Design a protein with these regions (language model features):
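Active-site-adjacent beta-strand/loop module that shapes the phosphate/pyrophosphate-binding cleft
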Residues: 35, 102-128, 139-143, 162
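Conserved Nudix-box catalytic region and its N-terminal flanking loop in Nudix hydrolases
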Residues: 45-87
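A short coil-to-beta-strand element that immediately follows conserved catalytic motifs
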Residues: 92-102
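Extended, polar beta-sheet/loop recognition surfaces of beta-rich domains
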Residues: 27-28, 44-47, 95
Length: 167
């Protein structure tokens, strides 16, 4: 597999193959870092359940997951989580209303930021499902189950445990 980061971002010179990070360029002396891209994930309660989407793209294609995606340049994580809910579900939310629920680093170094949105009273408050290339639909889970990503499963299980405990 080709190394996407095989060249210095400052001068374009090729790094030594398999050079560890951070990488110091032998040509210009600058140091390059490989930083994680944060992912904003929406935890959207609906009538005691939890909103999930069926993924239409890899990884974890055709599995259930919490709505989410990469934070774009110029966005706060709250704006990104709100945007992802809009893109994947069609649900319009206020980024100012989202609260930090959890942050977890994935084994590959990706930082996941889970944002808790105000609960919707019933599924009737959700827009009609409109599948597209990325999302095949959505549903409301009413009990814990395995999701397409282990960290999503962990957060969903925690949410349901808190609901059961009356928290």
């Amino acid at each position: 597999m080709p190394d996407r980061y095989a060249h210095c971002t400052f001068c374009g010179a090729r790094f030594v193959p398999d050079q560890p990070w951070p990488r110091r360029c032998g040509a210009c002396g600058e140091t390059s870092y490989l930083n994680p891209k944060p992912v904003a994930v929406a935890v959207q309660p609906v009538g005691g359940g939890l909103l999930v989407v069926r993924r239409g793209i890899p990884p974890a294609r055709d599995t259930l997951a919490l709505p989410g995606g990469f934070v774009e340049a110029g966005e706060t994580w709250q704006q990104a989580a709100s945007r992802e809910l809009s893109e994947e579900v069609g649900l319009r939310t206020d980024p100012e209303a989202v609260r930090l629920y959890d942050t977890i680093s994935a084994p590959d170094g990706t930082l996941l930021i889970f944002g808790l949105f105000p609960a919707l009273a019933t599924p009737d408050e959700l827009p009609p499902a409109a599948p597209d290339d990325e999302t095949l639909g959505f549903e409301v889970l009413h009990e814990p189950r395995a999701l397409g990503f282990d960290l999503h499963t962990r957060v969903a299980n925690r949410y349901f445990a808190q609901v059961a405990a009356g928290l």
